[in-house]
UniProtKB/Swiss-Prot annotation:
GO terms for cellular component: extracellular region. Disulfide bonds join C75-C90, C82-C95, C89-C110. Residues 1-21 form the signal peptide. This is U11-theraphotoxin-Hhn1a. Belongs to the neurotoxin 14 (magi-1) family. 01 (HNTX-16) subfamily. The presence of a 'disulfide through disulfide knot' structurally defines this protein as a knottin. Its main location: secreted. It is found in: Secreted. GO terms for molecular function: sodium channel inhibitor activity; toxin activity. The keyword Secreted applies. Expressed by the venom gland. Residues 22-74 form a propeptide.
Length: 113
């Protein structure tokens, strides 16, 4: 009976120690894989960040060009001389030949429609 207990105890201790060794080995493998994964993730993160910065720079460049080109030109107010070929009268005004005043200064002025 004693030999059965000793044998059982020996097998039990051996199984526990092997299981512990397997756990340690698995833990080391997992740690190595996570370290490799972290380096890969860092590389991927840096690459993505670089691409996003390039995209942001392009978008900001387009926005600045667009805002420069789309700025509304200054318009000429009512009763101000204008050019017949290039009228820059504000909205609601038309470049017309004056009826009485201003005939001697310039030939066209901005008037209400």
């Amino acid at each position: 009976m004693n030999t059965v207990r000793v044998t059982f105890l020996l097998v039990f201790v051996l199984a526990v120690s092997l299981r512990q060794a397997d756990k340690d080995e698995n833990r080391m493998e997992m740690q190595e894989k996570t370290e490799q994964g972290k380096s890969y993730l860092d590389f991927a993160e840096n690459l993505l960040l670089q691409k996003l910065e390039e995209l942001e720079a392009k978008l900001l460049e387009e926005d600045s060009e667009e805002s420069r080109n789309s700025r509304q030109k200054r318009c000429i107010g009512e009763g101000v001389p204008c050019d017949e070929n290039d009228p820059r009268c504000c909205s609601g005004l038309v470049c017309l030949k004056p009826t009485l005043h201003g005939i001697w200064y310039k030939s066209y002025y901005c008037y209400k429609k």
